[in-house]
Curated annotation (Swiss-Prot):
Biased composition (Polar residues): 213-226, 253-270, 295-308
Residues of the signal peptide: none
Domain WW residues, every copy: 229-262, 333-366, 393-426
Name of the protein described by the UniProt record: Probable E3 ubiquitin-protein ligase hulA
Predominant cellular place of this UniProt entry's protein: cytoplasm
Amino acid sequence: MGSNLPSQPNLRLTIIAADGLYKRDVFRFPDPFAVATVGGEQTQTTSVIKKTLNPYWNEMFDLRVNEESILAIQIFDQKKFKKKDQGFLGVINVRIGDVIDLEMGGDEMLTRDLKKSNDNLVVHGKLIINLSTNLSTPNTNQANGLHRSHIQPSTSSGLVPQVGASAAHPAASPAPIDPAASNPSLHPQRVPSTNRPPSTVAPGAAAGATPTNTQGSRTNLSSFEDSQGRLPAGWERREDNLGRTYYVDHNTRTTTWTRPSSNYNEQTQRTQREANMQLERRAHQSRMLPEDRTGANSPNLPETSQQAPTPPAGGSANAVSMMATGATTAGTGELPPGWEQRTTPEGRPYFVDHNTRTTTWVDPRRQQYIRMYGQNANGTNTTIQQQPVSQLGPLPSGWEMRLTNTARVYFVDHNTKTTTWDDPRLPSSLDQGVPQYKRDFRRKLIYFRSQPALRIMSGQCHVKVRRNNIFEDSYAEIMRQSASDLKKRLMIKFDGEDGLDYGGLSREFFFLLSHEMFNPFYCLFEYSAHDNYTLQINPHSGVNPEHLNYFKFIGRVVGLAIFHRRFLDSFFIGAFYKMMLRKKVSLQDMEGVDEDLHRNLTWTLDNDIEGVLELTFAVDDEKFGERRTIDLKPGGRDIPVTNENKGEYVELVTEWKIVKRVEEQFNAFMSGFNELIPADLVNVFDERELELLIGGIADIDVDDWKKHTDYRGYQESDDVIQNFWKVVRTWDAEQKSRLLQFTTGTSRIPVNGFKDLQGSDGPRRFTIEKSGDPVALPKSHTCFNRLDLPPYKTYETLEHKMSIAVEETLGFGQE
């Protein structure tokens, strides 16, 4: 074929970029370079791009070709080029005559899927190239005197040119990695793919010279543009620690995974953002805890029209009406000191307690009734039995009844030195037919909130902020006050707005502040590997020299929210809650931090690694462009990992990846948190309960959940599936949140509902798969939002097995 080639170059090849290369080694990213070969005679090599799955070259090569010529472009990992498989990452084969007419001339942009070699190694991703017959413009590679190593691929790679498919449409080229979001990786070693068993790595004889990392003046895309063109004004493109591209809107200081469209309209975006914020605000304000459900909740004004208060009657219909409307028996005589009666715009009376700055529908002068929730024949919680306190008989030995300053009855158990709202003379709704975890959590909550350290001190703590500057203003206000001042009655005021804080303003304050301070825009937190709404500490937060002060501030805010019984609209990875409780992290916790690393460390534990993995007790970490080797134990870089000590190695890697990298930031966070919440008190909760304590329990729409669920091995009409949804509907909000934690790893629901549920690899709908023996418990895969549900024969069996699985689970990783 060579004799038919022209004597001078007649085609210019530009190797632009590769996108989504296969990460064959979980312990590090590849160093990709491309080798272009025509007919086995002409060979050109790009420079090496360090540590990326999305290399961008944009390098030109002039070739001599005819219509029958086959252009083969292979991608290799430079670190593995001398191994048996040469670090092969994929190949494309293009017959020149199929894509361009050499006589007529032209310019073609091609995007081709990378193909496997004869070794059948797993590959994926795309390669973007350009072919042009226009050679009049200077070749920038040659103009800069770049020397290319001519590499003849070794036969050991088993590459046989194949004619590729027809040209695809151009795709978006990948972006260069932002130095501020560098990916720290473990010590470079060969780790098998999970899709195949590992084979012993034998050194392969690499023909030709190994490519050098020759850096010329290549055209790199700036962070304000990508392959689709320049971003709108004020927008920036970045990559997170997992190589995922996201976009920063500096106009509004927000981040998004979605590229702003070319017809970007700021007003439209603002309207959509405000609509989403309103949805999140409503969801946030509806969150509560078990203890809050049994007492009289303070009304949020203004309220929709309600029926006028009516005296309670003995009939169950009136009792149900009372539960629905909150109507109570009107009192007589003077109101207690500090109380005031007001009326809503709809004419409904409510009562203001100026002593505690709270509101309630309940007339403090009315006879105190004790309410008990029960179940009717249909199993729904609708029946309320009421009995006056005077008709219940004497209290058990060691118990005492007291009144709060708002005339609410509570009970003191001197035997255990605890207090509770529950009357011990009534059958407790916490004792019969209620899961153990619910009894525990609610009682823990009662105990926790009754402790002297959690009591609000006399006086007021005034915090004045501007809505459009809430992060900076809150930082200045909260950090200037002492911890004891922050324990006084919290009074929030928004600049330029009139209003007294009777609870609504502080709820709005914590909602807005949690959206700001956990925003990845500030580089303090980043989205986890699990999805794009759970958070973890950014190990590169040091880009902000004041980051430790900010973490102390955030710790204070989280403690402040718990102390004043408010919720934050933010959710963290499971390991973060365990760290707050000073619990040891485990390999299961790695799943939410780095799914690939979790999978490969699990493989390491389960398989023989002798002669397969060349690991040492050291990791490589890269921070702000500086690469350093960190020993996991003294002299670790010289200690090989064997079958005997691999368990210790996995533990040390897990601790380094989750805890050690962010130790400074986390300690600063906890120093602020413990100023308001003592460590010995918060330790009564487990990590799942701590998530609910900080974020509250959401009102879950089961219809929306069911609508956006996929099934594998089942159909929606199957009895097992029908029984599953029947069980979910009978559970209360707390149990549903527990189920959501069990199956997805968090109780957080996306703002647009279950249709936007995310997994570790992007959008991932909730899935129920037929799997397991009917005697086994259900199993969950939190990174994939999947529940493995055995084919249980009866409703009772399914309900029992589901309850045990949800109640007895320890930690967030289920597999």
